[in-house]
From Swiss-Prot:
Residues 11-106 form the Fibronectin type-III domain. The gene is ONCB. InterPro entries: FN3_dom (IPR003961), FN3_sf (IPR036116), Ig-like_fold (IPR013783). The lineage of its organism: Eukaryota, Metazoa, Spiralia, Lophotrochozoa, Platyhelminthes. Gene3D superfamilies: Immunoglobulins. It comes from the Eukaryota. CDD domains: FN3. PROSITE patterns: FN3. This is Oncosphere antigen B. ONCA and ONCB are the primary targets of protective antibody responses. It comes from Hydatigena taeniaeformis (Feline tapeworm).
Length: 106
């Protein structure tokens, strides 16, 4: 279970976390422009603090407005790097880092 205080609040405006299961969390966002650009891709890099666990990378279309991170482990701190890109430019137009701590997962 994730408590509100377990989820870092350093997301950009229009993005939010919510719990969808005991080992899953969802990132959702509103349709919006970033620095005047309409984004087309959302990239998530999920890096567990424990080196014995695998990092996860997710990429979804911005139009999906949601992505679910599954298979999170209990009592584990995760660093999540969010990057939003537009067009063929490889550079991100916004980036944020959040911390997730999964607690009480059975």
């Amino acid at each position: 279970e994730f408590r509100k205080s377990d989820i870092g609040s350093s997301l950009p405006q229009h993005f939010r976390w919510s719990q969808v299961g005991s080992q899953s969390i969802q990132l959702s966002w509103d349709d919006h422009k970033v620095n005047g650009h309409t984004p087309d891709q959302v990239h998530l890099f999920v890096i567990p603090r424990s080196s014995s666990l695998q990092r996860v990378e997710k990429q979804v279309a911005f139009s999906a407005k949601t992505v679910i991170l599954e298979g999170l482990h209990g009592n584990t701190l995760y660093y999540v790097i969010l990057t939003v890109s537009a067009g063929e430019e490889e550079c991100s137009i916004t980036s944020a880092q959040s911390e997730l701590r999964s607690m009480c997962i059975k």
